[in-house]
Amino acid sequence: MYLYGASGHCKVVIDSIESSTSKKIEGIFDDNINLKKILNIPIFKYQTFDKQRIKELFICVGNNSVRKLISENIKANYGTVIHANACISKYASINEGTAVLANAVVNASAKIGKHCIINTGAIVEHDCELEDFVHISPNASLAGNVKIGEGSHIGIGAQIIQGISIGKWVTIGAGTVVIRDVPDNSLFVGNPAREIKK
């Protein structure tokens, strides 16, 4: 397996892979020519990327829009990364390119899209539906039947009550408590959540 993006998030992905699988990480591609290694994994210039020899790839980029752009520009066999200490229901579905990190919970009948991040200690309860490129930050909690639109970012420790719909490319600030639906392309913060004009 190869990784793309030599960031702090990459370190967490490496740790998750090593915790839960015998897959060997062959290297990391990045456009920062000054980086040589991360956690003893060699870093290669993006210009040397050859998709013909890459059997499996994973994008280690926290920024949702950048992750989407990379996935659209690089057609590859994308794997999933699931930490050994994540708790995932056998009735949940998780699509390619998604990471579920340490102590995260994905419960029964939850559906997780492509290239999502379910970060450390995050909770995705029963029947939630996450579209592609969503990031659920550490210790954020989604109650049952929550829907999250493409590219949305749910901040650290945010809480979303049951049955709420969050639009596409929304930002929910850290610690925010969401008790009503949120429209596309908006920024909400506070308890209860209120909209901030971008």
Regions flagged by a language model, labelled:
Residues H9, N34, R194:
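Conserved Rossmann-like nucleotide-cofactor binding loop
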Residues N34-S89:
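Phosphate-bearing ligand-interacting subdomains
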Residues V81-V189, A193-I196:
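Structural signal for interior beta-strand "rungs" in well-ordered beta-sheet cores
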Residues L3-Y4, F29, C60, L101, ...:
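Short hydrophobic segments within beta-strands
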Residues I14-S16, L69-N73, I112, P183-D184:
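Short amphipathic alpha-helical segments
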Residues S20-K37:
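NAD(P)-binding Rossmann-fold cofactor-contacting core
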Residues M1-I17:
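Glycine-rich adenosine-cofactor-binding loop
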Residues M1-Y2, I25-E26, R53-F58, K168:
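Short active-site oxyanion
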